[in-house]
UniProtKB/Swiss-Prot annotation:
Key word Electron transport present: no
InterPro entries xrefs: Ribosomal_bL17, Ribosomal_bL17_CS, Ribosomal_bL17_sf
UniProt entry keywords in alphabetical sequence: Ribonucleoprotein, Ribosomal protein
Stated name of the protein: Large ribosomal subunit protein bL17
Encoding gene, per UniProt annotation: rplQ
Family: Belongs to the bacterial ribosomal protein bL17 family.
Naturally occurring in which organism (per UniProt): Chlorobium limicola (strain DSM 245 / NBRC 103803 / 6330)
Amino acid sequence: MRKVKPARKLGRTAAHRKATLANLTTQLLVYKRIETTEAKAKETRKVVEKIITKARKGTVHAQREIFKSIRDKEAVKMLFEDIVSKIGDRNGGYTRIIKLAPRFGDAAKMAVIELVDYAEAPSKQLPGKQDRAKRVKGSKKTEVVAAAAGE
C-alpha cells in the first residue's frame, strides 16, 4: 500500500525541488533573511536546520557533506566562519518564520524566513527634511527642500 511521504512537493519534479531548496538555503545563509512563500519557507527551514547542526561539528567531513547540497564555496565558508560562531551553543531553532500578507498577484501565502541571531529590528526612522518633497503652490511639480532653509 502506498504511503504518503511527509514532505511538500512544491509543484516540482524531484530534481527541481532539490535545486530550489538548495538555492533558497544558499540565499538564506548569504543574506540571513529572505522572503518567499510559506510552503517553501517551511521546507527550507528543515534543510537549513540540518545543515547548521552539521556545521557546528566543524570537521572537514561535515564541510564536505554540506558542500554536496549547497555547492557554493562562499556560502559554505560564511557558514563555518560567521554563522556557526555567532549561533554558538544554541541547540536547534536556528531559523524563524514570520508570516506576511498574501502576495498581490496570486494571493499566495508569503513568509519571511531568517536566521534567529541575525534578526535586525526594522528601523522606524522617518526621512529627514532634505529627503521630503514639498509641493509648490500653484503647480503640480515637486521640489526637494534643501537642508539649509536659506536656499
